[in-house]
Amino acid sequence: MRLLQLFLILSFNMNAQNNNLPFFEISSEKNHYTSVNIIYRLIEGVGYRYYWASKDLKKEDLDYKPSSSSISSYETLEHIYVLSETIMNSALNKVNNRPTEKTPKSYNELREGTLMNLQKFNDIILSKNEDDLKRIKIIFNRGGREASFPFWNLLNGQIADMIYHTGQIVSFRRTTGNPIQKGVNVFLGKTKLSN
């Protein structure tokens, strides 16, 4: 009985933690179509897809590789984390060092870090205007050589790449027999939770 109680408490705590992470659902639409609001909504869509694609992955899901020469789902999550870090750093015009200096070492830390990076980006982007967007740069430093790119490249680069790789996670987990939760509706940005 005591073991059952402990299991229930741990399960409840894990679910509470997951529900406290950003992008459990997409917020209501904004009243005006502005560049900032569109970017904000795009990141919400990316975050929502990632939230549900990466939720409740098991060891066999994380270890899965479609072929021996492919990277695993876990390695894909690491790559997605780096993409999210670059997205967040762009809002601050902060340098992205390559190779990446520090990546979270556990599945839960990767997942939370990725979602929090996207949330930080959205928190910052809401304070921007059209002129601010023109000043946002994606800055890379590789071995002391710095290169910067305009905000446009973030849209077809890291953001699009994150959507692509999130789709891989969805596909890989379906292959391992652990599909995403039923009720996830990426069109509405809401999830119908089953009881």
What are these regions (language model features)?
Residues 47, 51-58, 84-88, 115-126, ...:
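Structural signal for well-ordered, non-membrane alpha-helices
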Residues 57, 71, 102-105, 128:
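Short coil/turn linker and secondary-structure boundary residues
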